[in-house]
């Protein structure tokens, strides 16, 4: 997820090192970490449902975590894939930056884990 967020931010011309809340000089992806925060419950839900407390991060668990990019999530009351929800959030951030006004950001809403159905 962090890589998808970072690529989307870079595609919109934003500097990843300048965060909103994260501000470590040693972290080159402060902004990506800020934008990633609303998507953290998606990972938490997967871990709670699929990985036992004493289990190591197995290859199958890693595949499952990677597959979260293909999951469904609500964005602006519509079902979207996670990468598109990330893009919508970045677009709303760009509006706030470019027009010096603070409209509500398009934050994701967690839904039960399911693969996104493309039309």
Show the residue positions of the predicted features.
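N-terminal intrinsically disordered, cationic/polar leader segments
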Residues: 2-119
